[in-house]
Regions:
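Structured, solvent-exposed acidic/aromatic patches
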Residues: 34-41, 80-141, 145-423, 427, ...
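Amphipathic alpha-helical surface "interface" segments used
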Residues: 71-72, 137, 204-218, 338-348, ...
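Membrane-proximal, proline-rich intrinsically disordered regions
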Residues: 20-72, 108, 116, 122-125, ...
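Bacterial Sec-dependent N-terminal signal peptides
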Residues: 1-29
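Glycan-recognition patch characteristic of GH18 chitinases/ENGases
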Residues: 54-57, 62, 73-79, 83-86, ...
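C-terminal functional modules
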Residues: 420-533
Length: 533
Protein backbone atom coordinates (compact mmCIF):
# COMPACT_ATOMS: atom_id res chain seq x y z
CA UNK A 1 0.00 0.00 0.00
CA UNK A 2 1.22 3.49 -0.78
CA UNK A 3 1.26 5.65 2.33
CA UNK A 4 0.59 9.34 2.74
CA UNK A 5 4.20 10.45 2.58
CA UNK A 6 3.14 13.67 0.91
CA UNK A 7 1.58 14.75 4.18
CA UNK A 8 4.95 15.10 5.84
CA UNK A 9 6.20 18.10 3.80
CA UNK A 10 2.90 19.80 4.59
CA UNK A 11 3.35 19.11 8.29
CA UNK A 12 6.89 20.51 8.21
CA UNK A 13 5.64 23.62 6.43
CA UNK A 14 3.08 24.08 9.18
CA UNK A 15 5.87 24.35 11.76
CA UNK A 16 7.13 27.51 10.06
CA UNK A 17 3.87 29.30 10.87
CA UNK A 18 3.33 28.28 14.48
CA UNK A 19 3.89 31.84 15.69
CA UNK A 20 1.51 33.43 13.17
CA UNK A 21 -1.90 34.86 14.03
CA UNK A 22 -4.61 32.20 13.78
CA UNK A 23 -6.77 34.34 11.47
CA UNK A 24 -3.80 34.79 9.15
CA UNK A 25 -3.30 31.04 9.15
CA UNK A 26 -6.97 30.55 8.32
CA UNK A 27 -6.71 32.92 5.39
CA UNK A 28 -3.53 31.27 4.16
CA UNK A 29 -5.33 27.93 4.14
CA UNK A 30 -7.94 29.14 1.66
CA UNK A 31 -7.05 29.13 -2.01
CA UNK A 32 -9.68 31.24 -3.77
CA UNK A 33 -8.90 29.54 -7.08
CA UNK A 34 -9.03 25.96 -5.75
CA UNK A 35 -12.00 23.62 -5.62
CA UNK A 36 -12.43 22.99 -1.89
CA UNK A 37 -15.46 20.75 -2.30
CA UNK A 38 -15.17 17.90 -4.78
CA UNK A 39 -18.13 17.03 -6.98
CA UNK A 40 -19.40 13.81 -5.41
CA UNK A 41 -21.35 12.89 -8.53
CA UNK A 42 -18.10 12.86 -10.49
CA UNK A 43 -16.35 10.85 -7.78
CA UNK A 44 -19.17 8.29 -7.77
CA UNK A 45 -18.94 7.79 -11.54
CA UNK A 46 -15.18 7.44 -11.19
CA UNK A 47 -15.68 4.82 -8.48
CA UNK A 48 -17.97 2.81 -10.74
CA UNK A 49 -15.47 2.95 -13.59
CA UNK A 50 -12.85 1.88 -11.07
CA UNK A 51 -14.88 -1.24 -10.28
CA UNK A 52 -14.52 -2.24 -13.95
CA UNK A 53 -10.80 -1.50 -13.85
CA UNK A 54 -10.43 -3.32 -10.52
CA UNK A 55 -9.16 -0.18 -8.88
CA UNK A 56 -6.77 1.12 -11.50
CA UNK A 57 -7.92 4.50 -12.77
CA UNK A 58 -4.76 5.13 -14.76
CA UNK A 59 -4.55 1.89 -16.75
CA UNK A 60 -7.77 -0.09 -17.04
CA UNK A 61 -6.02 -3.25 -18.22
CA UNK A 62 -3.33 -3.35 -15.52
CA UNK A 63 -5.05 -5.34 -12.79
CA UNK A 64 -7.10 -7.50 -15.14
CA UNK A 65 -4.08 -8.58 -17.16
CA UNK A 66 -1.85 -9.31 -14.19
CA UNK A 67 -4.31 -10.95 -11.84
CA UNK A 68 -7.75 -11.67 -13.31
CA UNK A 69 -6.18 -13.15 -16.44
CA UNK A 70 -2.60 -13.96 -15.46
CA UNK A 71 -3.41 -15.71 -12.18
CA UNK A 72 -7.12 -16.49 -11.81
CA UNK A 73 -8.08 -17.55 -15.35
CA UNK A 74 -5.06 -19.82 -15.68
CA UNK A 75 -5.23 -21.28 -12.17
CA UNK A 76 -8.83 -22.41 -12.72
CA UNK A 77 -7.89 -23.69 -16.19
CA UNK A 78 -10.09 -21.52 -18.36
CA UNK A 79 -7.00 -20.26 -20.18
CA UNK A 80 -3.54 -21.64 -20.91
CA UNK A 81 -0.25 -20.08 -21.96
CA UNK A 82 2.96 -21.80 -22.96
CA UNK A 83 4.98 -18.76 -21.92
CA UNK A 84 6.32 -17.73 -18.57
CA UNK A 85 5.89 -14.74 -16.29
CA UNK A 86 2.80 -13.14 -17.83
CA UNK A 87 0.61 -16.03 -16.68
CA UNK A 88 1.81 -17.18 -13.22
CA UNK A 89 -1.43 -19.10 -12.68
CA UNK A 90 -0.54 -21.51 -15.48
CA UNK A 91 2.64 -22.93 -13.97
CA UNK A 92 2.31 -21.53 -10.41
CA UNK A 93 5.22 -19.14 -10.73
CA UNK A 94 5.64 -15.73 -9.11
CA UNK A 95 4.89 -12.32 -10.52
CA UNK A 96 5.15 -9.49 -8.01
CA UNK A 97 2.82 -7.25 -9.99
CA UNK A 98 0.19 -10.00 -10.00
CA UNK A 99 0.31 -10.07 -6.21
CA UNK A 100 0.32 -6.32 -5.76
CA UNK A 101 -2.16 -5.06 -8.33
CA UNK A 102 -5.52 -5.75 -6.62
CA UNK A 103 -4.25 -4.67 -3.19
CA UNK A 104 -2.57 -1.43 -4.17
CA UNK A 105 -5.03 -0.22 -6.76
CA UNK A 106 -8.16 -1.13 -4.81
CA UNK A 107 -7.01 0.80 -1.74
CA UNK A 108 -5.34 3.72 -3.47
CA UNK A 109 -7.90 4.38 -6.20
CA UNK A 110 -11.16 2.53 -5.73
CA UNK A 111 -11.66 2.63 -1.97
CA UNK A 112 -10.20 6.12 -1.71
CA UNK A 113 -12.99 7.49 -3.92
CA UNK A 114 -15.68 5.61 -2.03
CA UNK A 115 -14.28 6.76 1.31
CA UNK A 116 -14.53 10.38 0.18
CA UNK A 117 -18.20 9.98 -0.70
CA UNK A 118 -18.97 8.33 2.62
CA UNK A 119 -17.02 10.97 4.55
CA UNK A 120 -18.64 13.96 2.88
CA UNK A 121 -22.20 12.61 3.15
CA UNK A 122 -21.76 11.81 6.86
CA UNK A 123 -22.09 14.23 9.78
CA UNK A 124 -19.52 16.99 9.39
CA UNK A 125 -19.14 16.52 5.64
CA UNK A 126 -19.95 19.23 3.12
CA UNK A 127 -22.88 17.15 1.80
CA UNK A 128 -24.02 15.84 5.17
CA UNK A 129 -27.55 14.51 5.11
CA UNK A 130 -27.78 14.62 1.32
CA UNK A 131 -27.36 12.07 -1.48
CA UNK A 132 -28.72 9.20 0.62
CA UNK A 133 -29.09 6.78 -2.28
CA UNK A 134 -25.61 7.57 -3.57
CA UNK A 135 -24.22 7.08 -0.10
CA UNK A 136 -25.82 3.66 0.27
CA UNK A 137 -24.86 2.62 -3.26
CA UNK A 138 -21.29 3.53 -2.28
CA UNK A 139 -21.57 1.23 0.73
CA UNK A 140 -22.51 -1.60 -1.65
CA UNK A 141 -19.53 -0.77 -3.89
CA UNK A 142 -17.30 -0.74 -0.83
CA UNK A 143 -18.57 -4.15 0.28
CA UNK A 144 -17.91 -5.53 -3.19
CA UNK A 145 -14.32 -4.24 -3.16
CA UNK A 146 -13.48 -5.48 0.33
CA UNK A 147 -15.07 -8.86 -0.31
CA UNK A 148 -12.61 -9.38 -3.13
CA UNK A 149 -9.63 -8.23 -1.09
CA UNK A 150 -10.46 -10.69 1.71
CA UNK A 151 -11.05 -13.48 -0.80
CA UNK A 152 -7.70 -12.84 -2.50
CA UNK A 153 -5.41 -12.22 0.48
CA UNK A 154 -7.13 -13.17 3.74
CA UNK A 155 -6.75 -10.63 6.55
CA UNK A 156 -6.45 -7.04 5.32
CA UNK A 157 -6.72 -3.53 6.80
CA UNK A 158 -10.43 -2.72 6.99
CA UNK A 159 -11.87 -0.82 9.94
CA UNK A 160 -9.18 1.88 9.85
CA UNK A 161 -8.27 1.68 6.17
CA UNK A 162 -8.38 4.81 3.98
CA UNK A 163 -8.31 7.12 6.99
CA UNK A 164 -4.84 8.59 6.55
CA UNK A 165 -6.17 12.15 6.38
CA UNK A 166 -7.84 11.72 9.78
CA UNK A 167 -4.52 11.59 11.61
CA UNK A 168 -1.09 10.02 11.73
CA UNK A 169 -2.39 7.13 13.83
CA UNK A 170 -4.03 5.82 10.65
CA UNK A 171 -0.98 5.97 8.40
CA UNK A 172 -0.25 2.28 8.97
CA UNK A 173 -3.65 0.63 9.46
CA UNK A 174 -3.79 -2.63 11.37
CA UNK A 175 -4.95 -5.86 9.80
CA UNK A 176 -8.40 -7.17 10.69
CA UNK A 177 -9.59 -10.76 10.85
CA UNK A 178 -11.28 -11.96 7.68
CA UNK A 179 -14.31 -13.28 9.56
CA UNK A 180 -14.82 -9.93 11.32
CA UNK A 181 -14.60 -8.10 8.00
CA UNK A 182 -17.14 -10.43 6.39
CA UNK A 183 -19.58 -9.97 9.28
CA UNK A 184 -19.33 -6.21 9.06
CA UNK A 185 -19.68 -6.21 5.28
CA UNK A 186 -22.83 -8.34 5.52
CA UNK A 187 -24.22 -5.87 8.04
CA UNK A 188 -23.32 -3.01 5.70
CA UNK A 189 -25.08 -4.70 2.78
CA UNK A 190 -28.15 -5.32 4.91
CA UNK A 191 -28.37 -1.71 6.05
CA UNK A 192 -27.48 -0.10 2.73
CA UNK A 193 -29.80 -2.25 0.62
CA UNK A 194 -32.73 -1.70 2.96
CA UNK A 195 -32.13 2.05 3.16
CA UNK A 196 -32.15 2.74 -0.57
CA UNK A 197 -35.51 4.09 -1.73
CA UNK A 198 -36.98 5.46 -4.95
CA UNK A 199 -38.85 8.02 -2.85
CA UNK A 200 -35.63 9.77 -1.80
CA UNK A 201 -34.42 12.85 -3.72
CA UNK A 202 -32.31 11.99 -6.75
CA UNK A 203 -29.69 14.72 -6.17
CA UNK A 204 -27.73 13.78 -9.28
CA UNK A 205 -27.62 10.05 -8.52
CA UNK A 206 -29.24 8.85 -11.77
CA UNK A 207 -26.92 10.94 -13.93
CA UNK A 208 -23.83 9.82 -12.01
CA UNK A 209 -24.76 6.12 -11.89
CA UNK A 210 -23.51 4.34 -15.01
CA UNK A 211 -24.28 0.82 -13.73
CA UNK A 212 -28.04 1.06 -13.12
CA UNK A 213 -28.80 4.68 -14.13
CA UNK A 214 -30.24 5.44 -10.73
CA UNK A 215 -32.62 2.44 -10.71
CA UNK A 216 -32.89 1.92 -6.96
CA UNK A 217 -34.72 -1.40 -7.32
CA UNK A 218 -31.76 -2.84 -9.22
CA UNK A 219 -29.30 -1.51 -6.68
CA UNK A 220 -31.24 -3.22 -3.91
CA UNK A 221 -31.24 -6.48 -5.88
CA UNK A 222 -27.49 -6.25 -6.38
CA UNK A 223 -26.93 -5.53 -2.69
CA UNK A 224 -28.95 -8.57 -1.65
CA UNK A 225 -27.34 -10.73 -4.37
CA UNK A 226 -23.89 -9.77 -3.11
CA UNK A 227 -25.12 -10.65 0.37
CA UNK A 228 -26.13 -14.09 -0.93
CA UNK A 229 -22.67 -14.59 -2.46
CA UNK A 230 -20.88 -13.67 0.74
CA UNK A 231 -23.20 -15.73 2.93
CA UNK A 232 -22.57 -18.81 0.81
CA UNK A 233 -18.82 -18.14 0.89
CA UNK A 234 -19.05 -18.35 4.68
CA UNK A 235 -21.32 -21.40 4.73
CA UNK A 236 -18.62 -23.99 5.45
CA UNK A 237 -17.11 -22.07 8.37
CA UNK A 238 -20.04 -20.19 9.95
CA UNK A 239 -23.30 -21.99 9.30
CA UNK A 240 -25.35 -19.66 11.50
CA UNK A 241 -24.05 -16.56 9.73
CA UNK A 242 -24.73 -18.10 6.34
CA UNK A 243 -28.24 -19.17 7.31
CA UNK A 244 -29.11 -15.71 8.64
CA UNK A 245 -27.92 -13.79 5.64
CA UNK A 246 -29.20 -16.19 2.97
CA UNK A 247 -32.61 -15.70 4.57
CA UNK A 248 -32.16 -11.92 4.54
CA UNK A 249 -31.03 -11.95 0.92
CA UNK A 250 -34.03 -13.98 -0.23
CA UNK A 251 -36.44 -11.85 1.78
CA UNK A 252 -34.87 -8.61 0.54
CA UNK A 253 -35.04 -9.63 -3.10
CA UNK A 254 -32.15 -10.80 -5.27
CA UNK A 255 -31.66 -10.55 -9.03
CA UNK A 256 -34.50 -12.17 -10.98
CA UNK A 257 -33.36 -11.91 -14.62
CA UNK A 258 -30.41 -10.98 -16.81
CA UNK A 259 -31.87 -7.48 -16.93
CA UNK A 260 -30.65 -7.12 -13.34
CA UNK A 261 -27.00 -7.93 -14.13
CA UNK A 262 -24.48 -5.47 -12.71
CA UNK A 263 -22.68 -4.20 -15.81
CA UNK A 264 -20.37 -1.24 -16.35
CA UNK A 265 -20.78 0.15 -19.88
CA UNK A 266 -17.55 0.91 -21.69
CA UNK A 267 -16.74 3.14 -24.67
CA UNK A 268 -14.00 3.72 -27.21
CA UNK A 269 -13.23 7.13 -25.74
CA UNK A 270 -12.40 9.73 -24.82
CA UNK A 271 -9.65 7.79 -23.00
CA UNK A 272 -8.50 4.31 -23.88
CA UNK A 273 -7.03 4.08 -20.38
CA UNK A 274 -10.31 4.82 -18.60
CA UNK A 275 -13.28 4.25 -20.88
CA UNK A 276 -12.33 1.06 -22.71
CA UNK A 277 -12.74 -2.50 -21.45
CA UNK A 278 -9.55 -3.50 -19.64
CA UNK A 279 -9.97 -7.23 -20.31
CA UNK A 280 -10.34 -6.59 -24.03
CA UNK A 281 -7.32 -4.32 -24.09
CA UNK A 282 -5.23 -6.86 -22.20
CA UNK A 283 -5.97 -9.50 -24.83
CA UNK A 284 -5.04 -7.32 -27.76
CA UNK A 285 -2.18 -9.20 -29.50
CA UNK A 286 0.32 -6.44 -28.83
CA UNK A 287 -0.44 -6.61 -25.09
CA UNK A 288 0.00 -10.35 -24.62
CA UNK A 289 -3.17 -11.87 -25.99
CA UNK A 290 -1.54 -13.61 -28.92
CA UNK A 291 0.01 -16.55 -26.97
CA UNK A 292 -3.06 -17.05 -24.72
CA UNK A 293 -5.53 -19.81 -25.60
CA UNK A 294 -8.54 -21.57 -24.16
CA UNK A 295 -7.57 -24.40 -21.83
CA UNK A 296 -7.97 -28.06 -22.67
CA UNK A 297 -9.90 -28.44 -19.41
CA UNK A 298 -12.50 -25.88 -20.47
CA UNK A 299 -12.84 -27.01 -24.09
CA UNK A 300 -13.17 -30.66 -23.04
CA UNK A 301 -15.92 -29.69 -20.58
CA UNK A 302 -17.81 -27.65 -23.17
CA UNK A 303 -17.60 -30.50 -25.70
CA UNK A 304 -19.44 -32.84 -23.34
CA UNK A 305 -18.76 -36.49 -22.65
CA UNK A 306 -18.91 -37.53 -26.32
CA UNK A 307 -16.36 -35.54 -28.29
CA UNK A 308 -17.25 -37.38 -31.51
CA UNK A 309 -20.63 -35.63 -31.81
CA UNK A 310 -22.19 -32.30 -30.85
CA UNK A 311 -25.20 -33.97 -29.25
CA UNK A 312 -24.21 -33.17 -25.66
CA UNK A 313 -22.10 -30.07 -26.34
CA UNK A 314 -22.57 -27.11 -24.07
CA UNK A 315 -24.33 -24.46 -26.21
CA UNK A 316 -21.69 -21.98 -25.06
CA UNK A 317 -18.88 -23.83 -26.85
CA UNK A 318 -18.87 -21.60 -29.94
CA UNK A 319 -19.90 -18.57 -27.92
CA UNK A 320 -16.83 -18.72 -25.69
CA UNK A 321 -14.59 -20.08 -28.44
CA UNK A 322 -14.03 -18.00 -31.53
CA UNK A 323 -12.46 -21.04 -33.14
CA UNK A 324 -8.90 -21.82 -34.03
CA UNK A 325 -7.67 -18.53 -35.44
CA UNK A 326 -4.58 -16.52 -36.20
CA UNK A 327 -4.82 -13.22 -34.33
CA UNK A 328 -2.47 -10.37 -35.05
CA UNK A 329 -2.71 -6.63 -34.50
CA UNK A 330 -3.81 -6.34 -38.12
CA UNK A 331 -6.55 -8.97 -38.27
CA UNK A 332 -8.43 -11.91 -36.78
CA UNK A 333 -8.17 -14.76 -39.31
CA UNK A 334 -10.37 -17.83 -38.61
CA UNK A 335 -8.77 -21.17 -39.41
CA UNK A 336 -11.30 -23.69 -38.07
CA UNK A 337 -14.70 -22.95 -36.50
CA UNK A 338 -16.07 -26.50 -36.58
CA UNK A 339 -17.25 -27.34 -33.02
CA UNK A 340 -15.94 -30.90 -33.35
CA UNK A 341 -12.43 -29.62 -34.07
CA UNK A 342 -12.08 -27.20 -31.16
CA UNK A 343 -9.02 -27.96 -29.09
CA UNK A 344 -7.75 -26.44 -25.86
CA UNK A 345 -4.13 -25.98 -24.85
CA UNK A 346 -3.09 -28.11 -21.87
CA UNK A 347 -2.05 -26.08 -18.84
CA UNK A 348 1.44 -26.08 -17.39
CA UNK A 349 3.24 -26.80 -20.65
CA UNK A 350 5.95 -24.96 -22.53
CA UNK A 351 6.62 -25.15 -26.26
CA UNK A 352 8.82 -28.24 -25.94
CA UNK A 353 6.11 -30.04 -23.98
CA UNK A 354 3.48 -29.17 -26.59
CA UNK A 355 5.69 -30.46 -29.39
CA UNK A 356 6.08 -33.75 -27.53
CA UNK A 357 2.34 -34.07 -26.89
CA UNK A 358 1.40 -33.37 -30.50
CA UNK A 359 4.29 -35.37 -31.94
CA UNK A 360 5.34 -32.51 -34.17
CA UNK A 361 6.47 -28.91 -34.02
CA UNK A 362 3.36 -27.05 -32.88
CA UNK A 363 2.16 -23.84 -34.43
CA UNK A 364 0.02 -22.71 -31.52
CA UNK A 365 -2.11 -20.30 -33.55
CA UNK A 366 -3.14 -23.09 -35.92
CA UNK A 367 -3.71 -25.69 -33.21
CA UNK A 368 -5.60 -24.26 -30.23
CA UNK A 369 -8.91 -22.45 -29.79
CA UNK A 370 -9.05 -18.79 -28.81
CA UNK A 371 -11.55 -16.66 -26.92
CA UNK A 372 -14.27 -15.37 -29.21
CA UNK A 373 -13.05 -11.99 -30.43
CA UNK A 374 -16.63 -10.64 -30.25
CA UNK A 375 -16.24 -10.75 -26.46
CA UNK A 376 -13.01 -8.77 -26.62
CA UNK A 377 -13.99 -5.51 -28.30
CA UNK A 378 -12.64 -2.37 -26.66
CA UNK A 379 -16.13 -0.99 -26.03
CA UNK A 380 -17.64 -4.25 -24.75
CA UNK A 381 -19.40 -3.85 -21.38
CA UNK A 382 -17.75 -5.13 -18.21
CA UNK A 383 -19.77 -7.70 -16.23
CA UNK A 384 -19.49 -7.26 -12.45
CA UNK A 385 -22.07 -9.78 -11.22
CA UNK A 386 -24.75 -11.74 -13.02
CA UNK A 387 -28.14 -13.29 -12.36
CA UNK A 388 -26.89 -16.77 -13.30
CA UNK A 389 -24.64 -16.78 -10.23
CA UNK A 390 -27.60 -15.89 -8.02
CA UNK A 391 -29.73 -18.78 -9.28
CA UNK A 392 -26.88 -21.27 -8.95
CA UNK A 393 -26.16 -20.11 -5.40
CA UNK A 394 -29.85 -20.48 -4.55
CA UNK A 395 -29.70 -24.00 -6.00
CA UNK A 396 -26.74 -24.77 -3.75
CA UNK A 397 -28.47 -23.25 -0.72
CA UNK A 398 -31.58 -25.32 -1.41
CA UNK A 399 -29.55 -28.49 -1.92
CA UNK A 400 -27.76 -27.94 1.40
CA UNK A 401 -30.77 -26.68 3.36
CA UNK A 402 -29.44 -23.17 3.98
CA UNK A 403 -31.54 -20.09 4.63
CA UNK A 404 -34.92 -21.48 3.67
CA UNK A 405 -34.03 -21.82 -0.02
CA UNK A 406 -36.01 -24.48 -1.86
CA UNK A 407 -36.47 -26.15 -5.25
CA UNK A 408 -32.84 -26.66 -6.17
CA UNK A 409 -33.63 -28.11 -9.60
CA UNK A 410 -35.63 -25.08 -10.73
CA UNK A 411 -32.92 -22.68 -9.54
CA UNK A 412 -30.22 -24.75 -11.22
CA UNK A 413 -32.00 -24.81 -14.56
CA UNK A 414 -32.77 -21.09 -14.36
CA UNK A 415 -29.10 -20.44 -13.62
CA UNK A 416 -27.89 -22.47 -16.59
CA UNK A 417 -30.39 -20.76 -18.89
CA UNK A 418 -29.36 -17.31 -17.68
CA UNK A 419 -25.67 -18.15 -18.07
CA UNK A 420 -26.18 -19.35 -21.64
CA UNK A 421 -28.25 -16.32 -22.62
CA UNK A 422 -26.28 -13.43 -21.14
CA UNK A 423 -23.61 -13.07 -23.82
CA UNK A 424 -25.73 -10.93 -26.15
CA UNK A 425 -24.40 -7.92 -24.23
CA UNK A 426 -21.22 -8.42 -26.27
CA UNK A 427 -22.89 -9.16 -29.59
CA UNK A 428 -26.47 -10.09 -30.52
CA UNK A 429 -25.22 -13.16 -32.38
CA UNK A 430 -23.93 -14.71 -29.14
CA UNK A 431 -27.32 -15.25 -27.48
CA UNK A 432 -28.25 -18.92 -27.14
CA UNK A 433 -31.90 -19.73 -27.91
CA UNK A 434 -34.24 -21.58 -25.56
CA UNK A 435 -34.30 -24.72 -27.68
CA UNK A 436 -30.53 -25.15 -27.37
CA UNK A 437 -30.68 -24.66 -23.59
CA UNK A 438 -33.59 -27.11 -23.30
CA UNK A 439 -31.62 -29.74 -25.23
CA UNK A 440 -28.56 -29.22 -23.04
CA UNK A 441 -30.55 -29.53 -19.81
CA UNK A 442 -32.26 -32.67 -21.12
CA UNK A 443 -28.89 -34.20 -21.97
CA UNK A 444 -27.54 -33.30 -18.52
CA UNK A 445 -30.41 -33.83 -16.04
CA UNK A 446 -29.91 -32.20 -12.65
CA UNK A 447 -28.59 -34.56 -10.01
CA UNK A 448 -28.57 -37.51 -12.39
CA UNK A 449 -25.76 -36.90 -14.85
CA UNK A 450 -23.51 -36.09 -11.88
CA UNK A 451 -24.00 -35.36 -8.16
CA UNK A 452 -26.04 -32.18 -7.70
CA UNK A 453 -23.38 -30.14 -5.89
CA UNK A 454 -20.79 -31.09 -8.49
CA UNK A 455 -23.10 -29.88 -11.27
CA UNK A 456 -23.70 -26.60 -9.43
CA UNK A 457 -19.98 -26.07 -8.87
CA UNK A 458 -19.13 -26.79 -12.48
CA UNK A 459 -21.82 -24.43 -13.75
CA UNK A 460 -20.60 -21.65 -11.46
CA UNK A 461 -17.12 -22.26 -12.83
CA UNK A 462 -18.09 -21.99 -16.49
CA UNK A 463 -20.62 -19.17 -15.95
CA UNK A 464 -17.88 -16.90 -14.62
CA UNK A 465 -15.95 -16.84 -17.89
CA UNK A 466 -14.21 -13.42 -18.07
CA UNK A 467 -15.05 -12.87 -14.38
CA UNK A 468 -12.19 -15.11 -13.38
CA UNK A 469 -11.75 -13.35 -10.02
CA UNK A 470 -14.97 -14.90 -8.81
CA UNK A 471 -14.57 -18.19 -10.66
CA UNK A 472 -11.32 -18.73 -8.75
CA UNK A 473 -13.09 -18.03 -5.45
CA UNK A 474 -16.01 -20.32 -6.30
CA UNK A 475 -13.63 -23.13 -7.24
CA UNK A 476 -11.62 -22.74 -4.03
CA UNK A 477 -14.76 -22.87 -1.90
CA UNK A 478 -16.76 -25.59 -3.67
CA UNK A 479 -13.97 -27.76 -5.05
CA UNK A 480 -15.62 -28.37 -8.44
CA UNK A 481 -14.74 -29.04 -11.12
CA UNK A 482 -12.00 -31.41 -10.03
CA UNK A 483 -8.92 -29.87 -11.61
CA UNK A 484 -5.65 -31.71 -12.15
CA UNK A 485 -2.83 -29.41 -10.98
CA UNK A 486 0.17 -28.73 -13.16
CA UNK A 487 3.68 -29.41 -11.91
CA UNK A 488 6.06 -27.47 -14.11
CA UNK A 489 9.71 -27.33 -12.93
CA UNK A 490 9.43 -23.56 -12.51
CA UNK A 491 6.45 -23.85 -10.17
CA UNK A 492 6.66 -22.69 -6.54
CA UNK A 493 3.75 -24.57 -4.97
CA UNK A 494 4.83 -28.19 -5.16
CA UNK A 495 2.21 -28.96 -7.76
CA UNK A 496 -0.69 -27.35 -5.86
CA UNK A 497 -3.09 -24.87 -7.46
CA UNK A 498 -2.66 -21.44 -5.82
CA UNK A 499 -5.33 -20.67 -3.23
CA UNK A 500 -4.51 -17.03 -2.47
CA UNK A 501 -2.35 -14.10 -3.50
CA UNK A 502 0.70 -13.03 -1.55
CA UNK A 503 0.76 -9.55 -0.06
CA UNK A 504 2.58 -6.86 -2.06
CA UNK A 505 6.23 -6.43 -1.18
CA UNK A 506 5.51 -2.75 -0.56
CA UNK A 507 3.05 -3.74 2.16
CA UNK A 508 5.37 -6.28 3.72
CA UNK A 509 8.20 -3.74 3.92
CA UNK A 510 6.20 -0.57 4.45
CA UNK A 511 3.40 -1.31 6.90
CA UNK A 512 4.60 -2.30 10.40
CA UNK A 513 1.13 -3.70 11.10
CA UNK A 514 1.78 -6.45 8.55
CA UNK A 515 3.80 -8.39 11.12
CA UNK A 516 0.96 -8.72 13.62
CA UNK A 517 -2.28 -9.53 11.91
CA UNK A 518 -1.76 -10.54 8.31
CA UNK A 519 -2.63 -14.01 7.08
CA UNK A 520 0.35 -16.32 7.52
CA UNK A 521 2.23 -18.07 6.14
CA UNK A 522 2.23 -15.56 3.33
CA UNK A 523 2.41 -17.99 0.43
CA UNK A 524 0.29 -19.18 -2.46
CA UNK A 525 -1.07 -22.33 -0.81
CA UNK A 526 -2.30 -20.85 2.47
CA UNK A 527 -6.10 -20.93 2.54
CA UNK A 528 -8.32 -17.92 3.18
CA UNK A 529 -10.80 -18.19 6.05
CA UNK A 530 -13.73 -19.75 4.17
CA UNK A 531 -11.67 -22.21 2.08
CA UNK A 532 -12.05 -25.69 3.56
CA UNK A 533 -11.88 -27.76 0.37
Amino acid sequence: MKYLYKLFPALMLGLLFTSCDSEELHDLNINPQAVNEMNLNFIFTTAELGIAANGSSGDNRYTDWRTNIGMCAHAIQHLANAGGGIAPGDKYTENFETNAAPFEFTYNDQLKNIAEILKQTADGGYDAGNKANMRNASRILRAFSFQRLVDFYGNVPYFNANRGLDGSEYFFPEYDESSAIYKDLLKELDEASAAMSASLPDEGFAAADIIFNGDVAKWKKWGYSLMLRMAMRASDVDAALANTYVQKAIAGGVMTSNADNAIVPMALGPSEWTNQNGISRAFFPGDGGQPTFLSKTLIDYLKGADHATVADDDPRLMVISGGIADWTAAAWTPINTNPLDQKGMPNGKDQQDLDAIEGTAVDQAKTYSRINYLMLQDDDPYMIMNYAEVELLLAEAAERGIGGASNAKSHFEAGVRAACQMYNIYDASLKVDNAAVDAYLAANPYGTAKPALQMIGEQLWVSKFLNWWEAWSDWRRIGYPVLVPTNHPSGLTGGKIPTRLKYPTSEVAGNPSYKSGSTQPDDYTTRVWWDTK
